Amino acid sequence: MKLEVLPLDQKTFSAYGDVIETQERDFFHINNGLVERYHDLAKVEVLEQDRTLISINRAQPAAMPIVVHELERHPLGTQAFVPMNGEAFVVIVALGDDKPDLSTLRAFISNGRQGVNYHRNVWHHPLFAWQTVTDFLTVDRGGSDNCDVESIPTHELCFT
């Protein structure tokens, strides 16, 4: 089955998480007016007394065509990815309780200046780069037992 890739924006992505970006966001000045702070762009959640981790993930490009056959979710914490070198990347998400609801399966492509923060329990494809090796600043929960993986019928991404 084909899955159309849509441009990433907060309105269409809001059921799945937060788009981390400065475009059309409020800010205030700090540090004697030298810095614009775009404050509270995503809600970070960590359950069960674990701690929040900040890491860098170096992702390799996916083989083309991009084929989706499994999704994962993290029930005990949110997970954020922000590209550090301005590269666009693709995110694939779905809602659902015990298993992904394929009627909500969506794919989005960022503009290279956007990151994403997946809500807890949102099904998503494991991280990959799109066209070139990409470093991602990653914010997520430390600890174990926080990744459910489900196989799904194969979908091929369709870039229009």
Curated annotation (Swiss-Prot):
Required co-factor?
Answer: Ni(2+)
Q: Which reaction does it catalyse?
A: (S)-ureidoglycolate = urea + glyoxylate
- Which EC number applies? 4.3.2.3
One of this protein's GO BP terms? allantoin catabolic process
Supply the enzyme class, top level: lyase
Instruction: Give the family this protein belongs to, as stated in its UniProt record.
Output: Belongs to the ureidoglycolate lyase family.
Record function comment: Catalyzes the catabolism of the allantoin degradation intermediate (S)-ureidoglycolate, generating urea and glyoxylate. Involved in the utilization of allantoin as nitrogen source.
Database matches in PANTHER family: UREIDOGLYCOLATE HYDROLASE, UREIDOGLYCOLATE LYASE
Q: What is this protein called?
A: Ureidoglycolate lyase
What is the name of the gene encoding this protein? allA
